[in-house]
């Protein structure tokens, strides 16, 4: 700009202003030259070189060189004179306005919000805007300490009269309290310092820019304070260090900055915990507060600065609350150092927190409560929780997330090679990843040394679980979400549903904060070098000991192990797999091989095998001895029929249940108990203690000494020791055999009472001395009686039905759970699958009941009291800490007196003996036919579950009903005299729909006709009239009773794998006569069986409508209908193709029309069958009633159609020699269409009740049903 002259000719007393680094006069707008040396005022610094006031002014300017950041240094407010005057004036009063603005600012020597109000800046059309991009036109740029007419590094807001696209700040807003600062350059930062009017020295830092190199260097006396400032506080915050308690070492302090996890602020867990936002939920229950705290941590919203303002507002809205501005409110909102800070704090203290400024007070009210107060908005860029003042327990976990403006220049990520490791896909991939990281840091091997552990489908390691474990192990790893920390050496990524890890080979490890581990740190974060002793010495062993726990408990298990590690002089299984030793590689390879082979051959779970190896290696003094012991484990032969886990382990080392006591009871009557922690004494030495935090511990307790060596394994957790009582298992010798015989005979001759309730609060083990060992007195009967009061954990019965061994299809021998004529064997083998959390009656993702597939590994996380292998209809007791409390758990000694048995009713615990050849007995006993009967039981449970409402399948009443239904089905096989009869009796299950109708489930499946009683009676009458089933033939049964086949013949074809009702007669009818009649009879039967199999193979395996026909007709009827239908379709298509293509001109149009109508008839018939099929699938319970009513009418119409068409075909073939070929085809087609139309009309008349059931409303159904 320029005035009348090129140089100012005004008096030196005329005020000046700065614009773009140049000095101009406020009177003439010309450039002001330097004053003569005798007129210059040194107290005014750079301003004194151009301005000589008439009177002495009360403010001074520090010496400095004018730069872009502050023009001039210490008097940046002089650069605001021109833009303020230009934006608030017109063309005719600009000079007068310029003089007015200069007078106001020169009066105090600074720019403050009061000066803007005095100059009526806001009334004249100016507003503050946050800087989000280039600003056109005139503007005044500012931050919390500095203003300029040009953009500068660290500028956060701009004052302009131009309408910018972003939203203007609400009035009265001003980014600074006083714009009056000195500007220096230090390392990569720009430092602002000033002294406020009350004498408080403030400092602020911003990132450097390209123009920062020309700044004045920071004085040496301020370097220590600036180092504390840049490490402990975020950018653009004017800080007075006197308000804070500081420490010399930054490693143990707290930092508000986004680039450093630690700082010089003294860390107080009761002050800097980031949880002050929970004061908004003080009016709620403690459970709500704990839930909100856990949710913020688990979802990653909790940071060291608190939580996001929008998240806090949303959580209040979810809880039905909101915050309103109330001057008398109990909650006070504060900001860090200035009101524009994004770091907020909520406090209940009336005194202002040092280092913070008070903004307002709020009150939490209900959403539905009318109020006159203004709603408080927490803000989209604010974080609440900086310095909580409420005294709370120390938080073990702190998380962080970056929300501040990151420095523009971030340290580059070093270029290095990347190696990826993909762990085994066994469900524990997340923990294998951590094991691979630790193994590489210790042994240099980037693989997981942990054996595979098959986890349940609903138990997986989340990113929150991995972050917790990484912090416990202090690993230099991060969980990659949208971005990765540049300082992390190991990057853990989720590839679909599988965790993988990458390592940066050429990069040095660094200690990572919570923000870096979670992956929400800033781009320019700085991490200290990784210390030499950063990794715990036994980190790998701690991870190996805890990774089999539930995923949400692994980090707690690692922390418990590191806090109280076991002694190192013994070589346990975990130590052998993880610790460096010459035998580690060979031990690990041999152990993984045995883990894959031995449990499958023995029919045991992987968990049982792992526990057995742990017991074998207990107190092992050296790795050589551990390797020698492992090498003694025998691999069972594939030809062996059945091998127990005990036979695979060396003699003298019981596989399953070596006692955890150092001294066994010397007398069989001695009681062994696991007492509560406050008990002063007990017999024997206590076994392993139950781990804290819900971790399961395995206790092995022998029932008694002797050849039988009856033992029990108890998997118990912290839940079993509530109320100061533990699990007590007593072992005692019976005083006489008559007591056991009376107990056995008391229920032996009674019929099975299906209505007898199972004991819900008593767990009892009953054994009996076998005739094979009459001299043994070791079969004592321990009984643990549990008492409950209705105030704490509940007992839930989770049904485990049906088992299959590892790779063979024959189930295991489970007869011990049902009969009392064999020794009590409580070994853990092939433990059945536990129900999932979503639906305890089904396996997730499949349409199979839970008894189909056994879990391949023993889950340490199952909160169940497991007593070895149970029967298919047995249940596992689970403890839930919600309603009942365990108050008594004392052993009952059966050897003392008869009164001891009076407290326990033997009829409640002794299972009824089933006949030898019943289906359940065959399943329990095992053998070649056990798999067949297990599949039949599978079908029974599946059909029964289909009749239940899906949401009720997990209820105890439904499970009890399922067991009773199976018992009723099993009763039909109680009169069998051969092991082959039960399969044929139960193969078809034709009686099961009627049985379900007679005894419906507690909550039947809902359908359209379920609420109409009149319609139910109508359907019942139709079903009674039309469904007359012929009695089953008993020829096969008589033959089986008279000539029983040898038991060693394998019955592979007793029941087909596809669930059909036919059975092979070849292997079940072996005749001892080798005469020619017998040979002829056998050959005839063999030929018939072969033909039958061929028809089945052709029409039931390779036709899409096979299951459709079979679901509604008998097997023979379905085969004949398919054969005739296929031939009819082929002939008809042949005739249609000939008539429509070659001889279309020889026939009138009505013949072609009838031919096309015949095609549509077949299409409609097929669609009707498909409709019936899908409806029966969607409504199985209702379909049982509908099929009986409809299928005979439909079959009659189908036979009518086929017979008429067959007659037409015969007539056409008979007339073919007498008439032309074309005439015969035409007559056949016309006859086919006419008969098809009649049959189709008849079929529709018969199917209309089916359509009525599906589509008509209930009222129409009632009226029409009554009329019919």
From Swiss-Prot:
Residues 420-527 form the Peptidase C33 domain. Disruption phenotype: Knockout mutants display reduced infectivity. A zinc finger (C4-type) spans 8-28. Residues 69-182 are annotated as: PCP1-alpha. Residues 269-384 are annotated as: PCP1-beta. The active site is at 76 (for nsp1-alpha papain-like cysteine proteinase activity), 146 (for nsp1-alpha papain-like cysteine proteinase activity), 276 (for nsp1-beta papain-like cysteine proteinase activity), 345 (for nsp1-beta papain-like cysteine proteinase activity), 429 (for nsp2 cysteine proteinase activity), 498 (for nsp2 cysteine proteinase activity). One of its GO terms (cellular component) is membrane. Residues 737-749 have a biased composition (Basic and acidic residues). This is Truncated polyprotein 1aTF.
